[in-house]
UniProtKB/Swiss-Prot annotation:
Origin superkingdom: Archaea
Gene Ontology terms, MF aspect: 4 iron, 4 sulfur cluster binding; metal ion binding; oxidoreductase activity
PROSITE patterns: 4FE4S_FER_1 (PS00198), 4FE4S_FER_2 (PS51379)
Source organism of this protein record: Methanopyrus kandleri (strain AV19 / DSM 6324 / JCM 9639 / NBRC 100938)
Record pathway: Cofactor metabolism; coenzyme M-coenzyme B heterodisulfide reduction; coenzyme B and coenzyme M from coenzyme M-coenzyme B heterodisulfide: step 1/1
Name of protein: CoB--CoM heterodisulfide reductase iron-sulfur subunit A 1
UniProt-annotated binding residues for [4Fe-4S] cluster 1: C249, C252, C255, C306
Length: 669
């Protein structure tokens, strides 16, 4: 760090068009900045992020011999790298630039209070100047990148990302917790708005994955631990025992034919049954049987029937631990339906003939448990009058007990597709859709919505049903709803009610992976992107990308597009072969360190080790593993642990300057 009394600071206040200037008096702020100790130059400009604005900064650095720069503009998330590169081109260290967010923190939050916005901008700039005086250069380190990638999740997002990366020559490890890849898309009959057969477009990609020389599928497995950093992630995977030799099994199915045990089929959401030895669906990849040991009675019939010599059945299989080293990671985990039983007024789980859209999907699917026939679970008869209810568990802000606040994006179209498929199968059926709003946002979606109304005669009622009551004799369902367009209360007697359930993040899976990978989750439970517009597939952990529903609910086209984006992002460091890591990391004053180990205990990245040096136990930081979170510095009782670029001697003067006027007023009182 330079001598804080000798630095020459330039302050540059951006208008951001009118975003800042409309609320902040930028000219007044500039005049204020000129009087701050250490500031030798200050000016404003409409767009400092544009080329002319950056030229102004670079010329000022040279003309006024500036060695520190403060840019008061918008969020650093968008333009910090822009201004770092700008000052670097002018000959300064990029770390000698301090950025102040006076758009989100001043202008936007005080849009109707220009005086407050202006005074707050002054306070923030005053504090930034004090920090700028003490900024230090940050060393960097170049590390080799492993030429392989881990993809977590074998749905359509994981499949597409795997194929894109494998085709570029990278080694891909595709980990899926189920016995087969395919995800929820494999459950679907058709896809909207083109009504393509879902398996017809998914299965070829599954086969490509299975046959690709650069892809290693690790199914029936879960990621248990991840250590390391971009370019060098060390991954531990636990592969569950199938009790069937994957190399020996040919998928002939003779074992399932002789198995005497039948249990509800989770792939069919409990509608159909499967044997204790099974494949989830005929097109499974890999086509290898799995023994459900929870229900298996170990009668040995499957082993006797197996035509392989020796039999592929292996009751002695144990969990296998697999260790990998990869350069990048893509998280492509999926979703589960909202638990509709939480809404007692709809009777899901209580009334036999109330089902969800995904359960209906398995009925409509010709390869499903009912071979494409929609039936009432109560009596097996085909329903004549069906009521769909939109937004079950979605769009419930402030009513957490009723569901999630967000829109799940696909539910409306999911219902429209199934409503049309029912009408195609049974033209005389009466189909009602109770909706709040129909959100047909994608390409061809509005036309698909119109087709449901005009061509198929699906009836739409604008209103969320208040309750569903079952007739105990007929098992029919009375749906009570008010049409908010006409104000008319209605009672519809339905043979079958289908709940359009929202998409939610499986809590156990997402919470575990967030902890293992060190990535954040959004308030909706899905994984949080680095920036919703500019970095939609990146996370706060460099080298870890997200794709598909892992980032939030979306349809298949958006999922595939995002998977391709994540694959592209993951390929960059692997193509380059090396990455430069800025070492904004923890540092240890070994003379002060007492060797207590508190820092190592709180480090979420296992970047700190306790070692012996000169007969003394001290902390040692692995720079490339440290993510600069600062938890160790906060936990250190002696002050020996500091975070480079965010040291106490840099932050405390900034805080004192920020509070200076408030403290002066307090003293006067």
């Amino acid at each position: 760090m330079g001598d804080k009394d000798d630095v020459r600071i330039g302050v540059f206040v951006c208008h951001c068009g009118v975003n800042i200037k409309a609320s902040v008096d930028v000219e007044e702020v500039v005049e204020y900045a000129k009087k701050l100790p250490g500031v030798v130059y200050a000016t404003d400009y409409p767009f400092f992020c544009a080329d002319p604005g950056q030229e102004i900064i670079q010329e000022a650095i040279k003309e006024h011999d500036l060695d520190r720069v403060v840019v008061a503009a918008c969020t650093p998330k968008i333009h910090e790298n822009t201004f770092r590169n700008c000052v670097k081109e002018a000959g300064l260290s990029p770390y000698y630039m301090e950025m102040v967010n006076i758009r989100e923190h001043c202008s936007f939050v005080h849009m109707q209070e220009p005086e407050k916005a202006t005074e707050k901008a002054k306070d923030l700039i005053r504090a930034a100047v004090e920090r700028a005086k003490r900024l230090e250069d940050v060393p960097t380190k170049e590390v080799e990148v492993e030429n392989s990638v881990l993809i977590i999740g074998g749905g359509i997002a994981g499949i597409q990302a795997a194929l894109d990366l494998a085709d570029q020559g990278f080694k891909v490890y595709l980990v899926e917790k189920e016995p087969t890849i395919g995800g929820n898309m494999a459950r679907l009959a058709k896809t909207f708005p083109t009504d393509d057969c879902a398996m017809u477009i998914l299965a070829p990609k599954m086969v490509q994955v299975g046959n690709h020389p650069n892809i290693e599928m690790i199914t029936y497995a879960e990621v248990k631990d991840v250590d390391g950093y971009i370019g060098n992630f060390e991954v531990t995977i636990e592969k569950k025992p199938r009790y069937v030799d994957e190399d020996a099994c040919t998928g002939c199915g003779v074992c399932a034919e002789v198995c005497p045990i039948e249990v509800p089929n989770e792939f069919d959401l409990g509608i159909g049954t499967r044997k204790a030895i099974y494949v989830p669906f005929p097109q499974a990849m890999p086509l290898v049987y799995t023994i459900d040991m929870e229900h298996c009675i170990q009668c040995g019939l499957c082993e006797e029937a197996c035509p392989q010599d020796p039999p592929a059945i292996d009751f002695d299989q144990e969990p296998e631990e697999i260790r990998l080293k990869v350069g990048t990671i893509i998280v492509a985990t999926g979703y589960e339906e909202f638990d509709a039983s939480k809404l007692e007024e709809y009777g899901y789980g209580k009334y036999d003939n109330v089902i969800t859209t995904l359960e209906l999907e398995r009925m409509i699917n010709p390869a499903g448990p009912t071979e494409g026939h929609v039936i009432r679970p109560s009596d097996g008869k085909e329903p004549h009058r069906i009521v769909f209810i939109h937004c079950v568990g979605s769009r419930c802000p402030g009513k957490e007990e009723k569901g999630e606040a967000y829109c799940s994006r696909i539910c409306c179209m999911f219902i429209l597709k199934n409503a049309q498929l029912i009408k195609q199968h049974e033209p005389d059926a009466e189909v009602y859709c109770c909706y709040m709003d129909v959100r047909a946002f994608g390409k061809g979606y509005e036309e698909y919505y119109e087709r449901a109304q005009k061509q198929f005669g699906v009836r739409f009622i604008r209103g969320r049903p208040a309750e569903i009551v079952e007739d105990p004799e007929t098992k029919n369902l009375i749906v009570r709803v008010e049409d908010t367009l006409t104000g008319e209360p209605m009672e519809i007697e339905a043979d079958l009610v289908v709940l359009g359930c929202g998409l939610v993040a499986p809590e156990e899976t997402y919470s575990k992976l967030a902890d293992i990978l060190g990535i954040d989750r959004s308030p909706d439970g899905f994984f949080k992107e680095l920036h919703p517009k500019l970095e939609p597939v990146s996370t706060k952990v460099r080298g870890v990308q997200i794709a598909g529903v892992a980032q939030g609910p979306k349809d298949i086209p958006d999922t595939v597009a995002q998977a391709k984006g994540a694959a592209s992002e993951a390929s960059i460091p692997m193509s380059q072969g090396k990455v430069e890591i800025e070492l904004i990391t923890a540092t240890v004053d070994e003379d002060v360190c007492g060797g207590c180990g508190a820092c190592a205990q709180v480090c979420p990245f296992d970047a700190i080790e306790m070692v012996e040096k000169d007969g003394k136990r001290v902390a040692e930081v692995q720079d490339v593993a440290c993510q600069g979170c600062g938890q160790c510095a906060a936990a250190c009782p002696s002050g020996a642990m500091q975070l480079r670029y965010y040291r106490d001697e840099q932050l405390m003067p900034q805080i004192e300057a920020l509070l200076a006027e408030a403290l002066e007023e307090e003293e006067e009182e």
